[in-house]
Curated annotation (Swiss-Prot):
GO terms for cellular component: cytoplasm. It comes from Edwardsiella ictaluri (strain 93-146). GO terms for molecular function: metal ion binding. Di-iron-containing protein involved in the repair of iron-sulfur clusters damaged by oxidative and nitrosative stress conditions. Homodimer. This is Iron-sulfur cluster repair protein YtfE. The keyword Metal-binding applies. One of its GO terms (biological process) is protein repair. CDD domains: Hr-like (cd12108). The lineage of its organism: Bacteria, Pseudomonadati, Pseudomonadota, Gammaproteobacteria, Enterobacterales. It is found in: Cytoplasm. Belongs to the RIC family. YtfE subfamily. NCBIfam families: FeS_repair_RIC, PRK10992.1. HAMAP family: RIC_YtfE. Pfam families: Hemerythrin, ScdA_N.
Length: 221
């Protein structure tokens, strides 16, 4: 089977374990999910045949996760809220506190991520507002089958997804891609591990919405 002409977002949804592979090679399957594998590989100077081989191996391995492509939309919305929205609400306040501590204690050390707490708090505020709008406005419309009324709200949500992606780029830069310096304390290392987990969760969250929930709600798939 060839994968090169299929968009990254489609591959991320149809082969759930592909998201880990895409993160490994820094391929944006969320907001950049419309890019084909071939174009993404060329943009990042990656071996296309190697990528296709790895995807084929993943695709041939049975997956225990639910296939959300055929699930009722109300169940998909509920899953996103419980699996991702609640998780982000738990993750970000703790990460902000840890970042504040690291910046205060290690402010003079090489590699100290000065400004990280501010960026994480900005992300927290943006996501809090974003998720509330989804839960109070967009998801109820989707659950009621009001796809024709979803174009405007979905356009806003996709724009906010891109804004969140830009904040993640800043966070990656400040943390040297979540790489703690040699001799970093436990809190510092735990902070970067927590940020890595947050980014992985957020990318899966956005991919599920951009590449599956929103197109299905609009009747595009």
């Amino acid at each position: 089977m060839t994968y090169r002409d299929r968009p990254l977002g489609e591959l991320a949804i149809s082969i759930p374990r592909a998201t880990r592979l895409f993160r490994q090679y820094e391929l944006d399957f969320c907001c950049g999910g419309k890019l084909t594998l071939q174009r993404a590989a060329a943009r990042h100077s990656l071996d296309l045949v190697m990528l296709e081989s790895q995807l084929a191996e993943l695709d041939s391995t049975p997956d225990q996760h639910r296939d959300w492509r055929q699930a009722p939309l109300d169940e998909l919305c509920a899953f996103i809220v419980t699996r991702y929205h609640q998780r982000h609400r738990d993750q970000l306040p703790e990460l902000v506190l840890m970042a504040q501590k690291v910046e205060q204690v290690h402010t003079g050390k090489t590699g100290c991520p000065r400004g990280l707490a501010k960026q994480l708090d900005s992300l927290r505020q943006e996501l809090d507002s974003h998720m509330m709008k989804e839960e109070r406005i967009l998801f109820p419309l989707i659950e009621q089958g009001e796809g024709a009324r979803c174009h405007g709200p979905i356009s806003v949500m996709e724009h906010e997804h891109r804004d969140a992606g830009e904040l993640l780029d800043v966070i990656r830069f400040l943390t040297d891609n979540m790489t703690p310096p040699t001799g970093a304390c436990t809190t510092w290392r735990a902070l970067y591990a927590g940020i890595s987990e947050l980014i992985n969760d957020l990318m899966e969250h956005v991919s599920l919405e951009n590449n599956l929930l929103f197109p299905r709600a609009l009747g595009d798939v």
